[in-house]
Amino acid sequence: MSKRYAVVSIGTNSTRSLLADVAVENPRVEAARSIGTRIGEGLGESGRLGDEPMQRTLDAIAQLARAIRGHYVRLFVVATSALRRAENAEEFAERVRTLLGVPLRVLTGEEEATASYRGALTAFGALRGERVGVLDTGGGSTEYAAGSTLRPDNVVSCEIGAVRLTEGVPDLAGRDGAVPAEAVARAREIAREALKPLAEQEAVERLAFVGGTATTAGYILKGQRTPVLSYPLTREDLQRTLDRLLQAKLDDRKRIVGLKPQRADILPAGIIILD
């Protein structure tokens, strides 16, 4: 018997929906969609969610909810880094409740890391039995979890993401042309400092990347726009992709096959964090 659950997830850069049948042994994803909403735009400077980012996120939530309405037995709405930090998070949460009739749950960094880890291991069942690390680079934070079963034994959340790093080093966006070497060096130093907790982690047999930065790098390397699942990425792959982005101005980045235009300004920051 089918038992479909739906989730709407509000990230710093994107809002996503997922519909899955959880009645089977291995949950089966039946529909998934992502819309670039960037609710975290300007949050680092003001400490608040802006009116325009909130409204476009609410519009996206309504659009995603319409597409899956009637196909699930229960709907969950969650949010991550931007809502953890925003002074007016409760105001936005109330607007979501009014829109959907469902409470918004703001995940802690540790809960987010655990969810990314379990999702990755469920999708890539062949990884089970090894000690695996899962690194999820988002728009506002970066999560890491490791373990050898579906329950991670170590989770870390770091306060850095692709949107936050780009806003901290605006030249990374490429609006004025190629990114200066000084800006890249500054971004690497910021990332290195924020990610210090990861340097202390126990070695793993395999490291899996999840999130928009890693999947977009895979799209670009394969030269395609269709979904990439379980695509191997080496440090050389990441560096080659980063070099290409850093040398291109923003308008030219938007024409790269596999790169969604709304992610063109923040992808270099995301790759710097991954690397």
Regions found by a protein language model. Give the residues of each.
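A generic, well-ordered mixed alpha/beta core segment in the N-terminal half of proteins
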Residues: 133-141, 145
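Acidic active-site catalytic centers that drive phospho-/nucleotidyl reactions
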Residues: 9-11, 112, 136
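Short flexible coil/turn linkers enriched for glycine and charged/polar residues
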Residues: 11-13, 71, 98, 138-140
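Helical "lid/coupling" subdomains associated with nucleotide-phosphate turnover
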Residues: 3-5, 19-22, 38, 42-71, ...
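Structural motif
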Residues: 14-16, 141, 214
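N-terminal basic/disordered segments at the start of proteins
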Residues: 1-28
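Short amphipathic
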Residues: 31-35
